[in-house]
């Protein structure tokens, strides 16, 4: 389901812009339409009010929590969609949330579990927002990063539609919506045109073109230097620094040559380098460098004027890196079993109809 389809249904039921905004605001904030002294039957046209319970049930069925896996750095949710497919969302520290944009992924990064089975299907914009609604039914969400399963650039229309809603009725600051991509020229064309301009995270991982092709075999053929220049143009236009993502792989992209390459590419740029130690994937053939080595790399870049953050990869303590939780559940055969009870379903109802 797409958000535009929801808007069309509301309008077909007699909704004016103020009614449409009220419904979408309540949904994106995981709130009932009846709050305090505000009664929906006093606000909505009768035909619209009569159709809201059915619409609310459809929205609630878009995404449900199949299982939750607590960890030191946040909880990972296995989210079941209406057709039985599953994706992962991660409740991050400081009211952050990581959402998925596809079931599977076509990029096939060598160090990632998600792309092993290829792309299964796109998520509709409403399914993307539904992950935020699920999270908000559990706790506050003030930042959303599009860094879960899938490549957002390969589902651009749906992702941008979700961003537009979250940055308006959803009440999330534009710089707290982070679009992550391996690099696609369409992203740099489309993002500046939107009314909501998100922050941008670029998957760099290496400064060496040949190694980048090996690590991300089906990513667009963008030279790292060109990718950085495209990012810099967007950063200067929006006023948000580009976040460069770098998965640290021991003996692969953690040597002095790479450090010098980072300095060469990012010196003077409006950028933040995020070092993320590799989250082990069985059979991938990579290893995580020691924390001490990773910290030394970050210190070196700091001394050279590159703002660098060393981040924990969410889910390391529960073997729940991107795609791993879903793969483990599929391997166990648990997807054929009923989902856990979901008390956090959000349904748009009028008072007295629940």
Swiss-Prot record:
What keywords are assigned to this protein?
Answer: 4Fe-4S, Cytoplasm, Disulfide bond, Iron, Iron-sulfur, Metal-binding, Methyltransferase, S-adenosyl-L-methionine, Transferase
Q: Which residues bind S-adenosyl-L-methionine?
A: 150-151, 180, 203-205, 279
Pfam families (UniProt xref)? Radical_SAM (PF04055)
Q: Which domain of life is it from?
A: Bacteria
* Residue numbers annotated as active site: 88 (proton acceptor), 322 (s-methylcysteine intermediate)
Query: What is the disulfide pattern of this chain?
Result: 98-322
EC number(s) in its UniProt entry? 2.1.1.-
Q: Where does [4Fe-4S] cluster bind?
A: 105, 109, 112
A biological-process GO annotation = tRNA methylation
Give the required cofactors: [4Fe-4S] cluster
* Binding note for cofactor: Binds 1 [4Fe-4S] cluster. The cluster is coordinated with 3 cysteines and an exchangeable S-adenosyl-L-methionine.
Any one GO MF term held by the record is: 4 iron, 4 sulfur cluster binding
Q: Which family does it belong to?
A: Belongs to the radical SAM superfamily. RlmN family.
| PANTHER family registered for this protein in UniProt | 23S RRNA METHYLTRANSFERASE, RADICAL SAM CORE DOMAIN-CONTAINING PROTEIN
What protein name does the entry list?
Probable RNA methyltransferase AZOSEA28700
